[in-house]
Amino acid sequence: MFGRRKAMPQATVDVATSPPLAPIAPVDLTSHEQVSAVLGVAAGIGQVLIAAGTTNFDAKNQVVAVTEAYGLFHCHVDLTYTRIRLFSYVADSRRNPVTVVRVMPAPVQDFLRLRRVDTLIRDILSGRASLVDAQARLNAIITAPPSLGLVGVVCSWMVLGGAVTLLLGGDVWAAAASTVASGLVIWLAAVLGRRGLPLFFQNVAGGFCAAVFASAVYHAGLVVGLLLRPSMVIATSIIALLAGLTLVQAIHNGVSFAPVTGNARFFDTMLITGGVVAGVAIGIEVSVLLHVPLPPMETIAAPNLASATIRVLGGAVASAAFARACYADWLSVGVSGLTALVGSSVFYFML
């Protein structure tokens, strides 16, 4: 009863912004190699955070916290959408400057890598990771292969596509068609990406395939007496292509003194979205030329208790599938699905 109370966990960014009591793992600040190593670890951590979608403000706080944890308090951090630069100097009589530059890789939503970096940051701030240990662990995190192969990623996106169709009010047949369409566009994007095709054209190709596939499935369903909603097939394919894009990051960067990165993220989002719209438009026109046009948009009835329950379950499965597609471990997948289940239940049953 009177035992020691367990400290509640804090978010990493809150830990990072807390003032350090003292250098936890100090290094020789008069050594150019030691200072460069500290800046290299901090820059690598910032590189992973930015690539995972962390805003510049939060990433800068964590980079500064890492350098201060090793006793390097005089460090300037310059972050943009494509580059991170750290400036400091050797604490000797000559004060020779030290600069470390890292070029940002293409944004990749790898939740497992982000979680490992989060653990590394906590270990550095708590003194459990020396500089040598941090270098080795960071290198292992950056060079580690994806925890999920292409087949697993495609299957996760297929599950997401089918679940989103149920979330939108579709039936089982529409969900099955959306599952196949999502897998097709994600597989096509992965193949084109490996060949070096820019993301804009990947999304054009994905949108084109989604529209043509939806038209083909709709007319094939008419032959066997099934009335499918091709609009749902196209919508779920678009969600699969654009699931990683958000305006929240752009706006957050814009209001947190990072206008360059905010504008870059905003333009990037608009350009890639335009690629999907162009691909879908081309696919619709090609379907008309092939005499298999798409029907007008259908209206969906208001949800009742049964359909609302299916939508809630669809939202939970879609959230869990997205987390798995982003390489999250199974515990995180379960938490993601449970969170979506609670949120969807509140929305459909209480509001």
Residue ranges of predicted features:
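Alpha-helical transmembrane segments and their membrane-interface boundaries
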Residues: 108-115, 119-351
